[in-house]
Regions:
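Active-site phosphate-binding strand-loop segment of PLP-dependent enzymes
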Residues: 145-209
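PLP-dependent aminotransferase class I/II
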Residues: 54-55, 76, 226-305, 309-311
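PLP-dependent aminotransferase-like
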Residues: 111-169
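Short loop-beta-helix segment that forms the pyridoxal 5′-phosphate
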Residues: 73, 85-107, 120
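N-terminal "arm"/small-domain region of PLP-dependent enzymes with the aminotransferase-like
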Residues: 7-71
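Helix C-cap/helix->beta junction micro-motif
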Residues: 134, 194-195, 224
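Short beta-strand
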Residues: 44, 310-314
């Protein structure tokens, strides 16, 4: 958020605000270069990172164990996968670790290599970018504002035709914050399995939901092998620079393909060590959820009484 002095600089340097380049909102260096605003003065609202910042407990532990950088990480990430399994009640043998969820999204798309994919939109632009790199055609099913951006499951399924090979859903969705309940998601996954369609669910924001158990599709990975759930720690755990993500699928053949084509030691030693610390910090988990839930309710109530604004209940 620029100050008044910087706004005056826009006018002096004739910067056309209507012809700005496209870049990720967290790319502060590019924003600094284009708008001539020191990145230290920018308050970034686009990254959706936990306002509490990195866990103090994790900071202390990490500072005391920086020697982990002198060792190669476990190539199989055994301890980390066990920590992930305990964190989200998943079988560690069904878990693949990656250099952020972005690497896993890219790896999944390249290995599934769909000729056509169906996206639930509006949504994270990285999905369509990765699909374009392999020459896949994409169809976007748009959530409707008049329906408060909630999904009409039956209508969505009518678009899951036999020529679609991959369905991508961000749940809860970015940027609408709307979420699909687990029962509805199972209906989608079940019908997709009958039509030989693989489903990727990005749960980057699921820990922010009022009731995680009502939304997460991780339990469904035990029953459906045409499904992969992807998560990361960038948002909830305020660690976007760590680049730690994980995916969960019960498809042994697909897991084998992912491991064969993934670079070894994809996640470095610091990332693997810190990832375990983050997922085991239950105090931080509960403190964050308490803050987000109370602030969401407060801000929703305030915005509801302001002229010109309509907040949408995502859950």
């Amino acid at each position: 958020m620029p100050n008044t002095q910087n706004l005056e600089l826009y006018q002096e340097r004739n910067i056309d605000m209507d012809k700005k380049p496209e870049f990720h909102g967290s790319d502060l260096e590019k924003i600094e270069e284009y708008y001539h605003i020191p990145k230290e003065e920018i308050i970034c609202f686009s990254a959706n990172v936990n306002p509490l910042g990195l866990s103090k407990k994790v900071k202390k532990e990490l500072a005391s164990n920086l020697d982990v950088i002198t060792r190669y990480p476990d190539r199989n990430y055994t301890s980390l996968r066990e920590a992930i399994g305990n964190y989200c009640s998943a079988d560690p043998s069904h878990i693949v670790v990656g250099n952020g969820s972005t690497e896993l999204i890219s790896l999944l798309i390249s290995q599934r290599a769909p000729k056509k994919a169906l996206l639930l939109g509006p949504t994270y632009s990285e999905y369509s970018r990765e699909l374009s790199l392999i020459g896949a055609s994409t169809e976007t099913y748009h959530l409707q504002e008049e329906n408060d951006f909630h999904l009409n499951v039956d209508d969505f399924l009518s678009h899951c035709t036999e020529d679609v090979a991959l369905v991508i859903i961000c749940n809860p969705n970015n940027p609408t914050s709307s979420a699909i309940k687990k029962n509805d998601m199972e209906q989608i996954i079940c019908q997709c399995k009958k039509r030989n369609i693989f489903v990727m669910i990005d749960e980057t924001y699921v820990e922010f939901a009022p009731c995680i158990e009502e939304i997460t599709a991780i339990p469904l990975t035990k029953r459906y092998d045409n499904l992969m759930v992807i998560r990361g720690v960038s948002k909830f755990y305020a660690a976007p620079g760590l680049r730690f993500g994980y995916g969960i699928t019960s498809s042994e053949a697909f897991l084998k393909s992912l491991h064969q084509h993934q670079n070894p030691w994809s996640l470095n030693s610091v990332g693997a060590y810190t990832g375990e610390l983050l997922l085991k910090d239950t105090d931080y988990f509960h403190e964050t959820r308490a803050l987000i839930l109370s602030e969401r309710a407060r801000m929703f109530a305030r915005l509801s009484h302001m002229d010109g604004y309509k907040p949408y209940a995502g859950y």
